[in-house]
Curated annotation (Swiss-Prot):
It comes from the Eukaryota. Keywords: Coiled coil, Cytoplasm, Leucine-rich repeat, Membrane, Phosphoprotein, Repeat. InterPro entries: Leu-rich_rpt, Leu-rich_rpt_typical-subtyp, LRR_dom_sf, LRR_R13L4/SHOC2-like, Synaptic_Scaffolding_LAP-MAGUK. It is a peripheral membrane protein. One of its GO terms (cellular component) is cytosol. It is found in: Cytoplasm; Membrane. The modification Phosphothreonine is found at residue 480. This is Leucine-rich repeat-containing protein 1. Interacts with DLG1 and DLG4. May form a complex with DLG1 and ERBIN, where interaction between LRRC1 and ERBIN is indirect. LRR repeats lie at residues 11-34, 35-58, 60-81, 83-105, 107-126, 127-149, 150-172, 173-196, 198-218, 219-242, 244-264, 265-288, 290-310, 311-334, 336-356, 357-380, 382-405.
Amino acid sequence: MFHCIPLWRCNRHVESIDKRHCSLVYVPEEIYRYARSLEELLLDANQLRELPEQFFQLVKLRKLGLSDNEIQRLPPEIANFMQLVELDVSRNEIPEIPESISFCKALQVADFSGNPLTRLPESFPELQNLTCLSVNDISLQSLPENIGNLYNLASLELRENLLTYLPDSLTQLRRLEELDLGNNEIYNLPESIGALLHLKDLWLDGNQLSELPQEIGNLKNLLCLDVSENRLERLPEEISGLTSLTDLVISQNLLETIPDGIGKLKKLSILKVDQNRLTQLPEAVGECESLTELVLTENQLLTLPKSIGKLKKLSNLNADRNKLVSLPKEIGGCCSLTVFCVRDNRLTRIPAEVSQATELHVLDVAGNRLLHLPLSLTALKLKALWLSDNQSQPLLTFQTDTDYTTGEKILTCVLLPQLPSEPTCQENLPRCGALENLVNDVSDEAWNERAVNRVSAIRFVEDEKDEEDNETRTLLRRATPHPGELKHMKKTVENLRNDMNAAKGLDSNKNEVNHAIDRVTTSV
């Protein structure tokens, strides 16, 4: 009986073999019979541990994929692959690249990422046809001083290494378009970085940079700049020269201001400045006419600039966890705004003009001090309106009411007015010895005063028959919290009691505090 064998075994002229994800432990023997014609060999994602001597007789190879194996050695015979154009040995266990790699003169794309390498061979810069080099996550401590000899290099990835400086010759890579230096230990960026005029993407996130050189403004073709997770205290005014920039990520730094030159970035689409120390945004940000996403989370902003209303393409605005006490009415000018988040601020009102942002679908105002919402919000087609962390549904049922201070029609619901945000345990523990501070932690004077407007005050006047006392005695009943607020208050005081009982050095106050809390929880 005859058995049909695979066509690629019959045909002696095979140019490509794909054996990825085949659980191979050894290189298949049948591959070698095609040594005269094989140009592409893909053995990625197997369990190969070594490359036999016979393997390097495949001298016609132009593309070799060996990534995601367990290869422990790259032999000097790699030099036999003189026609090799693409080599991927990423995510193996190769401790060293042989100097003989320099004989692979045709090599254009190489990926050595994810190996236990600590250095590149000195001969590496002789691979002058190399256009794309990836050496991410290999514990690389330094680059060859003559790396600038790779003058055809267009993409260089050096992410997640141990680099502390960049050799001067790096700036000779005049054709470089992508440079990824993220998650290293670089303290200074050389001024000569401004010579990389063809650079389009520059990643410097996760380093130790305290400043950027003025020369960075020379990168007229730069599209993406990521300098997040550094120690930047300021940005150079020359950043205004990055006229092609579309993405600017400067999150997690120490910035207190943004230069006015930001307004000259007319093509800027994404601006992320979260987790800094900004107290204000420059009015110039309103000149970034192409801005679609603005992230300002976790700063110290008190308000937003009026010019923000000029951002007609802005679709996502996030200013969570700041110190905002008000919003400009010009926010309604953001006619493309779909997501607006101002969670955990100090807002007491939302301007009615926000309803002019007719594309708004998500509004997150949880964790503020809002008394009510403007009636104009009913004109929006909201899909989610968040007022509380404990809100079970994205939309609530609202009632129309009247603001007795202004006479305006307003919206209210069971979650309004908002309670102030709950203090953290670390903030409470040092103060929990004082009973009055405990009360302050679970109530707010502003809430008590303003709640009167929601529920009429009830006064009980003592009978006039008591003529011996001429004083008029009254009992003022404050507004009763909604059921949801009562549960929140009960949970708050119970958590405080547990934290305080566990704290050391507070035994003397324990009975007094527990007694006070028991009275509160019992009434709830």
